[in-house]
Amino acid sequence: MTQRNAIVVGGGIGGLTAASALARQGWRVQLHERQPEIRAVGAGIYIWDNGLFALDAVHAYSEAIEGAHEPPSIDMRGQSGKTLMRIKINGESQPRCLTLLRDQLIKALVNAAKDAGVELVTNSSVVAVRPEGEVHFEHGDHSTTDLVVVADGVHSRLRDSVDLSYSRIRMSQGAARIMIPQSSHELPAEDRGRILESFHGSRRLLYTPCTPELVYLAFTCDSDDPAISGAYINTSEWSRSFPTLSDALRATEGVPATRWDTFEYVRLASWSRGKVAFLGDAAHAQPPYLGQGGGTAMTNAIALANAVSSDMELSEALATWERITRPGIESTQRTSYQQRLLNYVPDRVRNPLVRIAGLTSNVAKSQLKATEIRPTLGSTGGSR
């Protein structure tokens, strides 16, 4: 059988996973990244069961999770620090979720891609793709391939080049992210190791241990909130909102955030056009309230590679991939998007609502449904 060729656009989580998965299915794969090097932008990341499954499938699991934190629970709390809802994780018969550094994840995926034989091309900007499989580069060159996978992020410039209709919602909220040393602050003994998500007004503060040395803080608020000014956090403002975490917040004084990200929701009319397939934030961006942006990108990449490597014609394979995979991912998107509504409920109403929700197993199940997503066509063969 003649070896098929694929070009992947974008060196992020979804693109690297797709490239590795395709190469392990026998494709000759080039991945193009417009930056001078493939690197992470961000801080920490949550990898749930579904993402761990995908990492295993592309043989990146062991390197990615080395030194990762295994929290016992995710606690949702009010301003007073009282726990309103606790989701237990990583115990027997409980969902798995590891927290790790984003740059470690990217390095593991880069190494897995190289090991699989993927050709990584940096400083390579793709300006257009065509349904016939043409890929056009910034300096006028172009290539024709059997499959194009576009994973160039929420700001994708390539969706329009195949005349693909889509909806894109920029939300009023976003987040700034900062890493601080574990040694910079003290928590009560019973809180150590836990993920803490605290609410006050329209602000959320997410406290996530990532490694034995580092904690990841995410400051979620409206884009015009004076508690964030440029690259810096107004420590006193956030301490007033979350006094029980003031010790940790003092450690952010003078530390620039990695960047501000406005949350977005993207829905494509179709995930493919001709020989071009879209995945990750370019196809199904979601706000990060469930911690599933990376996980859904990776599992969708595995599903795509499995589908197009089957005996089906490409058009049938892409249609089957979308038909089987899209409902689960869009369910995750909707649940995450609905979570934004909590931002604008007064504390006196939100706190009892969250407390009652914590007593109802169906609420936790709906939030964790995405962790059960697994590709169902074929197999890339895991490393564990």
From Swiss-Prot:
Record field: catalytic activity: 2-heptyl-4(1H)-quinolone + NADH + O2 + H(+) = 2-heptyl-3-hydroxy-4(1H)-quinolone + NAD(+) + H2O
Keywords: Monooxygenase, NAD, Oxidoreductase, Plasmid
Up-regulation conditions: Up-regulated by PQS.
A GO term, aspect molecular function: FAD binding
Gene3D superfamilies assigned to the protein according to its UniProt record, in alphabetical order: D-Amino Acid Oxidase, subunit A, domain 2 (3.30.9.10), FAD/NAD(P)-binding domain (3.50.50.60)
EC number, as in UniProt: 1.14.13.182
Superkingdom of source: Bacteria
Its job: Involved in the degradation of the Pseudomonas aeruginosa quorum sensing signal molecule HHQ (2-heptyl-4-quinolone) to anthranilic acid. Probably catalyzes the hydroxylation of HHQ to PQS (2-heptyl-3-hydroxy-4-quinolone).
Listed PANTHER family: MONOOXYGENASE (PTHR13789), PUTATIVE (AFU_ORTHOLOGUE AFUA_6G14510)-RELATED (PTHR13789:SF309)
Family: Belongs to the 3-hydroxybenzoate 6-hydroxylase family.
Protein name in the entry: Probable 2-heptyl-3-hydroxy-4(1H)-quinolone synthase AqdB2
Species, as recorded: Rhodococcus erythropolis
Organism lineage: Bacteria, Bacillati, Actinomycetota, Actinomycetes, Mycobacteriales
Gene name of the record: aqdB2
